[in-house]
Swiss-Prot record:
Protein name per the record: N-(5'-phosphoribosyl)anthranilate isomerase
PANTHER family recorded: N-(5'-PHOSPHORIBOSYL)ANTHRANILATE ISOMERASE
Entry superkingdom: Bacteria
Pathway annotation: Amino-acid biosynthesis; L-tryptophan biosynthesis; L-tryptophan from chorismate: step 3/5
Keywords attached to this entry: Amino-acid biosynthesis, Aromatic amino acid biosynthesis, Isomerase, Tryptophan biosynthesis
Single annotated GO MF: phosphoribosylanthranilate isomerase activity
Species name: Myxococcus xanthus (strain DK1622)
E.C. numbers: 5.3.1.24
Amino acid sequence: MSVRVKVCGVTRLSDAVAAWEAGVDALGLNFYPKSPRYLDLPTAAALARTRPPLGTVLGVFVNAAPDTIRETVRACGLTAVQLHGDEPPEACSGYGVPVIKALRVTGPEDVVRARTYVGVGDVAGLLLDGAAPGYGGGGVGFDWSLVAGLAGSGVPVLVAGGLRPSNVAEAVRATRPYGVDVASGVESAPGIKDVEAVRAFVRAAKSINLWE
């Protein structure tokens, strides 16, 4: 079995199509207004329509109002929600789709905090990211050994932060995650994906057999 790959911050139709063709399992569409990868609803809906039958399209939100999230899920046909802000456990349900809760990691205390989301509401997975300024997409990594703190939690874990084609295989070997997530590590500019880098990232990530 190989790791799942999510490419976040897609803004162009051609990049979305190329990512699916490269073997990506999920795309993240950014609805955080302060992000350089922010999308309006018509653009996001068009990108979501590129989804193949077994693909996942997540909407990425930062401290957004629940009604805004629900409206966006309906308008764009999202299949999951990623909460990437300071949302408490009680905010992780009520959107009609599974929730991935992202948490910035600087030390063991953040992994302890991550465990408070396990089994709560509609949380279907946890995404551990580096603590870059702002919320995500900063290309900052974290100590991969901390992922072991979620061993036995029963919740799928995705690793993000500072990943790129040259180090993602190492990250998969070190953490044995359910998935890996990349944004800036496969870009030529914020929101502009380098298709060759996406292909190389997918090849490297999926070259590791998680059952070995």
